[in-house]
Amino acid sequence: MMQVDRRIIYSAALCSMLFSYLIHYPRFSNAIYSDIVSFWYRGFNKARLPYLDLAFEYPPLAGFLAYASSIAGRDVSSYYTVFSIIIAASYLLLVETTIRICEDRRVSLGYALIFLALSPSVILYSIYNFDAIFASALIASLYFFMKRRIKLSAILFSIAGLIKLVNLILLPFLALRLESWRERLLYAILSLGIFGAVNLALWILNPSFIDETYLYHARWGLENAWFLIFFPSESSWDLAKLFSLFLLCYGLLKVYVRGFEDQVTEVFAILAVFLLSNYVFTPQMVLWILPLLAAMGRMPIPYFGLELANSMIILMWFESPNPVELGSLPQYFALLRALMLFMILLEAYFGFGRVGSERKD
């Protein structure tokens, strides 16, 4: 893999985010759908406080960022622009953190360029939802964890959880890598304490907070899950969610038993297991694993199929009468995406090509 100056990576990432900003820009007649814009019309345009005056299905920090953007912006365009600036700043932090991890691991920065700046998912989904911000906090937490700056890592881990809850499945695996029970307890207290305190305060202020924010997702149906082929009817989706939980537990157990020596690969495997087992796999979630693929220093062939399928999901979504139905084009692409991600996971699990096989001299 060729060597790349970090300034090129930053420039390319900024260009991709600018393109993402433009294709979702709400004033354009042919703009591609973005969750950010939809939030505006759900009550943020009236400056309503999330969790208190407005039900919002994302964790507290996500709601605060959306609210702050709505206050700073007087209309949908300025709101969208402020939100995009927040995402762009977070994404540049993600790029910098990933570059530092690559340098520490002696991995060519060409991987960071490809995965973080040139991937179609970055163009389509960076200015879309909270996932880029979540990934930034999570990877920063991982970076400081590997630097043994445990307190800072735990704080960033808690921040990631306040944006999206998913990273909590990583906590036991991170704790096992700490040398003493004192460190493990400290990491758990900081990670869960900040997260718990914020959520407890909101629950006290609004007893419906937990139901409206977290249990909301438990009632959501199957969306882009590969196992829709086994549960095509909505009447079977409760069973599908049990199947999803079984897959998650089985996959995490396999990761634990495997005992990855390389922490970056382990985190990738855990997130890949979650994405493949969850009954909701929205396309922007792929942003979580791109920095990890870059830091692993490998170019899996299925990656190209993964990106193609992931891009086509949103491009075909509004071209289909019922995009969540089995047999629709988005669900065919979701199935292909799952197959590609599973192949990448197998490569990582069995060490095909070995992690970081291409190192810089």
Model feature map: region roles:
Residues M2-E212, W237-D361:
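Multi-pass membrane glycosyltransferase architecture that uses lipid-linked
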Residues L49-P50, G221-F231:
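Extracytosolic (periplasmic/ER-lumenal) interhelical loops and adjacent juxtamembrane/interface segments
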Residues Y216-A218:
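Intrinsically disordered, low-complexity regulatory segments in eukaryotic proteins
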